[in-house]
Curated annotation (Swiss-Prot):
Keywords: Cobalamin biosynthesis, Glutamine amidotransferase. GO terms for molecular function: ABC-type vitamin B12 transporter activity; catalytic activity. The gene is cobQ. This is Cobyric acid synthase. It comes from Clostridium botulinum (strain Langeland / NCTC 10281 / Type F). It holds the Pfam family GATase_3. CDD domains: CobQ_N, GATase1_CobQ. Catalyzes amidations at positions B, D, E, and G on adenosylcobyrinic A,C-diamide. NH(2) groups are provided by glutamine, and one molecule of ATP is hydrogenolyzed for each amidation.
Length: 493
């Protein structure tokens, strides 16, 4: 089996998309390929068919490889709950909560498990494309590293180092990273990649030659800056406002926002523009307000209260349409109770009181794939998605359920999810990916179009669009990199 590891000079330099591109290229060339990231830190996660939790970047990479996402592609997932604490997910299930120092002291015990996972991949696939995290030059973390050079050494993988020229200082970051590596680590780095380049590459070439003289490894290519409609899990990046897009969707950007990838399918609508808001001054008059998921719902509710957005949301709810997802659904209720102090020591807190329901946080985390139908006799409306939450919500007779769940992790079930008020303009659900399917997204956006005097439209199938974008990504990267050299590095062709 062949293997290659993509590391970067920093976070957000484009490692995840380079891995996805290589997965798609190798697949196109007829090889069985699998992505692997030993440890990921992200608030954007996904639930596999067997109910396990993993990072979204490896989900996109799995699709690029033509595979169903599996938790073994990302055995360790860290989900920050505050600046100093995180929830640890191991093999798709909650392992526990820890401080940064606690996990630092803990992680070496996972090395054997990671090696076992990788050995299994060696048996099942022709090529494994690995991804590092942050930078391999974090010298204070070197002795307990299990995600960058520590993982590369564990499985004897060659490394390609990616730098982001769009940030500026790419030559310094590449040379500086190499300077801080140990001799054995330097020998693993077989080439550099410059990512996100804008302009004429001829102007860059003298710098590439000088860089090679300094670091003594070749530059394998320059990848142009490209806007793609693919998920970004590293942070809630600002959406690009579309010119002349008549439908304005505002999204509350809370401090602990999670699973904002729920919004990606909305970006596929040509006449829809999405913007984040963090203050009441930015609120304005959106056609739809989305309150997304949160890793700390109570803290984010306090944030809405403190910055004045609570007042703006309540005023908007009189005539505007609101969709809350997971934590965003919970804050719409009248009360949130936390008897086991899962999130804070407050015990309970009043919600926005836009839906007559109460949420209680439990000790056990719900992680499940679901299929549901919208409770609307006029429409055959099916939604596929997943749930990740620790709260159970109960509502009064004044509130109608939004969906009926009929499949849970492949088993037939029959229970309700979500809620919608009597007026029909405020609703919420626990289902992540609720907009990914055509029917519900099309229904919501067409209601907004009609309200503005616009014609209804058919929505794109998000999965088809994603496949086209992955092929586009692969084409760009194939044309930009020396693939013959990369095949030589991994010992193939």
């Amino acid at each position: 089996m062949a293997k290659i590891m993509i590391q970067g000079t920093a976070s957000s330099v484009g490692k995840s998309l380079i891995v996805a591109a290589l997965c798609r290229i190798f697949k196109q060339d007829g090889y069985s390929v699998c992505p692997f990231k030993s440890q990921n830190m992200s608030l954007n996660s996904y639930i596999t068919l067997d109910g396990k939790e993993m990072g979204r970047a490896q989900v996109v990479q799995a699709y690029a490889a033509g595979l169903e996402p599996e938790a073994y592609m990302n055995p360790i997932l860290l989900k920050p709950t505050s600046d100093k604490k995180c929830q640890i997910i191991v093999n798709g299930k909650v392992y526990g909560n820890s401080t940064a120092m606690g996990y630092h002291n803990l992680k070496l015990r996972f090395k054997d498990m990671l090696k076992e996972h990788f050995n299994k991949l060696e048996e099942d696939f022709d090529i494994v494309v690995m991804e590092g995290a942050g930078s391999p030059a974090e010298i204070n973390l070197r002795d307990r590293d299990i995600v960058n050079m520590g993982m590369a050494e564990l499985v004897d993988a060659p490394v390609l180092l990616v730098g982001d020229i769009d940030k500026g200082g790419v030559f310094a970051s590449l040379a500086g990273t190499m300077l801080l590596l140990k001799d054995g680590e330097k020998e693993r780095v077989k080439g550099t990649i410059i990512n996100k380049f804008r302009g004429d590459v001829e102007i860059l070439k003298p710098g590439l030659d000088m860089l090679e003289d300094i670091v003594h490894i070749p530059c394998l290519g320059v990848v142009p800056y490209t806007r793609l409609q693919l998920e970004d899990e590293d942070g809630a990046v600002e959406f690009n406002k579309k010119a002349y897009a008549p439908i304005d969707i505002a999204v509350i950007k809370m401090p602990h926002i999670s699973n904002f990838t729920d919004l990606d399918a909305l970006k596929s609508e040509e006449d829809v523009s999405i913007r984040f808001i963090t203050s009441k001054e930015e609120f304005k008059e959106p056609d739809l307000l989305v309150i997304p998921g949160s890793k700390n719902t109570i803290e984010d509710l306090l944030y809405l209260r403190k910055c004045g957005l609570e007042e703006s949301i309540k005023e908007y709810s009189k005539d505007g349409k609101i969709v809350g997802i997971c934590g965003g659904y919970q804050v719409l209720g009248s009360k949130i109770k936390d008897p086991y102090k899962v999130e804070t020591d407050l015990g309970e807190i009043d919600g926005l009181n836009l839906l007559d329901m109460e949420t209680t946080f439990e000790k056990e985390k719900v992680t499940t794939r679901v299929s549901a139908k919208l409770i609307d006799e006029k429409i055959e409306n099916t939604v596929y998605g997943y749930e990740i939450h620790m709260g159970i919500s109960e509502y009064s007779e004044n509130v109608k359920p939004l969906f009926k769940i009929y499949d849970k992790n492949g088993e037939k079930v029959d229970y309700f999810d979500g809620a919608i008020n009597e007026k029909g303009n405020v609703m919420g659900t626990y289902i992540h990916g609720v907009f990914d399917g055509v029917s519900f997204r099309e229904k919501i956006i067409n209601e907004l179009r009609v309200k503005k005097g616009l014609k209804k439209k058919k929505s794109q199938v998000y999965e088809h669009m994603r496949e086209k974008e992955l092929d586009k990504l692969a084409d760009i990267v194939r044309q930009s990199l020396d693939m013959k050299k990369i095949y030589s590095i991994i010992g193939m062709k």
